[in-house]
Amino acid sequence: MIDPQTLRDHPDLVIASQELRGASVEVVDQAVAADSERRRAVTEFEGLRAEQNAHGKLVAKADKADKPRLIAEVQELKARVTAAQERAQEAESALDEAMRRIPNIVIDGVPAGGEDDWALVREVGAKPSFDFAPRDHLEIGEILDAIDMGRGAKVSGARFHYLKGIGARLEIALMNFGLARALEAGLVPLITPTLVKPEIMAGTGFLGAHADEVYHLDDDDLYLTGTSEVALAGYHADEILDLAQGPIRYAGWSTCYRKEAGSYGKDTRGIIRVHQFQKLEMFSYVDPADAEAEHERLLAMQERMMQDLGLSYRVIDTAAGDLGSSAARKYDVEAWIPTQDAYRELTSTSNCTTFQARRLGTRFRGEDGRTSPVATLNGTLATTRWIVAILETHQQADGSVRVPEALRPYLGGLEVLEPAAAKAAR
């Protein structure tokens, strides 16, 4: 959640952020009113409790004649203190509920508007050209006997798939390539849980506007995560971190699950938008003063991956109205998909400032000895969807695919993915 002090001292900043997002400003007014009521209720409770304590001392010192009256007054005060405490607790809960309805305050410079109002940061790499009619990734995958959508649907339903043979090897190679880069950069690898408690899912901000995209196991009251960001954010919940040596950085590898609610009819062909996939997620805990620099660092790691995979891509600064509730700024990295004649998102990186840490109780101790919320950031370093861009970008006329040089060590030195028919004919 946002900093209550910012809400109290600068509600105009919160209102401006809501306007950039195209979101309700009434929730800000409601939170300001709830904060005022909480402070009034707490002041009343503390005043009555102090009066109760003072009367208790008088009873101890009173003579016999005055004690009955003073004891009666103490009993009356006790009832009033109990009632005031309940009102203070109710006011605290109301404030917490109101604060949780306010998304993160966007960072200066984030473009206003919705999904189509992003700002271009840069375009990198020449778009691939072909002297033949390029095939889409699913057709290539079928030629390679690498992707099986039919059996995925037979076993699990729409938007499920099998990666087979070289398809499975390609995904594992891609993930291992990302992991090697993460290790090189000093990130600590984690295999994360894919089932988390409601308070962790809510703490990361995934039970707000996008709650309908999350799978829930009703009998166990656990959520399936759509990204290891959730488990990585929860890893240090209710802890005080030592950032004296710099940021704490992780790379979480997990299977991810998404309902893809609201995407009916979109990307029904192939593996661009599926219910289950693999993802390697970077996650950083940093001093809030260093958060924007860390954001650029994560983006640079993602761009290096794109370049080494030989992909043409662009970076966009996502508009405020297209940000999730936790993000104060998000960069999307979109690769060129030849058969769609369009850029499609392959990865993103978000600066969540202290929003998630406040919800999850994750703090660090500053030089003055005081504790305060850390900043959290995340970004994807490899995921299943990248196979789409790799297959389409590096395809050849005979249905084979050139393996990007950087990926070859993770495929046993393989330089070309050959059509299954060609291999069978040998």
Curated annotation (Swiss-Prot):
Recorded E.C. number(s)? 6.1.1.11
Positions bound to L-serine: 227-229, 281, 380
Determine the domain of life of the protein's source. Bacteria
**Which Pfam families does the record match to this protein?**
Seryl_tRNA_N, tRNA-synt_2b
Task: Give the subcellular location.
Answer: Cytoplasm
A GO BP term here is: selenocysteine biosynthetic process
Q: Does the keyword ATP-binding apply?
A: yes
Main function: Catalyzes the attachment of serine to tRNA(Ser). Is also able to aminoacylate tRNA(Sec) with serine, to form the misacylated tRNA L-seryl-tRNA(Sec), which will be further converted into selenocysteinyl-tRNA(Sec).
Q: What is this protein called?
A: Serine--tRNA ligase
Source species taxonomy = Bacteria, Bacillati, Actinomycetota, Actinomycetes, Micrococcales
Q: Which gene encodes it?
A: serS
